[in-house]
Amino acid sequence: MDPSVTVIIPTYNWSSVLPYSIGSVLRQTFTDFEVLVVGDGCTDDSEAVVRRIGDPRIKWINLPINTGHQSEPNNEGLRQARGQFIAYLGHDDLWLPHHLSCLISALKQGADLAYGTILFLLAGPNGYHRWFWPTYERYQPGMSIAPTSVVHRRSVTDQVGGWRHYRELDTHPDTDLWRRAYTANYRFVFVPRLTAIKFPAAARHDVYKIRPCHEQAAWSERIQNEDGFEPAELIRTVLPMVAEYEAKPYKTLLHDFMQRTRKGLMQRIRHLISPPARPKGDSIEARREFKGLPRMP
């Protein structure tokens, strides 16, 4: 019998993080899934690391050449998917245990694409800067939604097509895919739960030269061992604002929090987003260089 969900994990030469991302899938309360770990022409020990996990639901696939972005690994995952629902997980990201159950529930209630709130962790000299994204319910065309936070019906990509190559686009491939799905009148539903954690490589200089996993290890341990991890993280992020705005009405506080979350995140990644006049795909190439990867030929 085919699984309900196909989880696609695109990866490239960063094997140390895979036990943590894959482990967060294996700890899901919803267990009817397969996991396709798709290497983008990996040349390191990623295959051996995946096989050592030893779960029959996990399949290793490696593309013959490096394509430079998650689009083609995701497309290969879509081609080999057996599930009626598709979930994506960045190889250096983590899911909370209720991620699939929350989003699959929304799909079973009629959504075509569901997404939860993701905690972005940007490392700074004095610790983490935390942002939740998205901070509002309604999808708007062009809105950024991290693939790690998305589950959609396989019929969506069957109809609108898969992931486009970044050099064909003036925007990012994930933003392009969500916009095409929305334009085709598929129903988007926001699930107001914190369901995933993202460690954006585009905000970590030379991370692909260092290939660390200490952040994923520490946060994975917290997720597993801290009771009430989700509300605790919400409180940790909101409390500094409470001290500053304790005299303000709740609605004002919430509005300010949403605005700060969006503004703060965008300020830190704006230098990685290409202006319209730049060549197609140039922002992805800039991200690659910042992360410690060479520009693609």
Question: What is each of the regions a protein language model found here?
Answer:
Residues M1-S24:
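N-proximal low-complexity "stem/linker" segments adjacent to membrane-targeting elements
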Residues G23-D32:
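Short, acidic, metal-binding catalytic loop of nucleotide-sugar glycosyltransferases
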Residues G39-A48, I65-T67, G90, L96:
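A conserved acidic beta->alpha catalytic loop
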Residues L63-A81:
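Glycine-rich, basic loop-to-helix element that forms the pyrophosphate-binding segment
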Residues I86:
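Short aromatic/hydrophobic "clamp" motif used to bind/position activated sugar donors
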Residues L94, H98-Y128:
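Conserved donor NDP-sugar-binding/catalytic core segment of glycosyltransferases
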Residues T117, G124-P147:
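Short, flexible, basic/aromatic active-site loop/helix in glycosyltransferases
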Residues Y136-S220:
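Conserved nucleotide-sugar donor-binding catalytic segment
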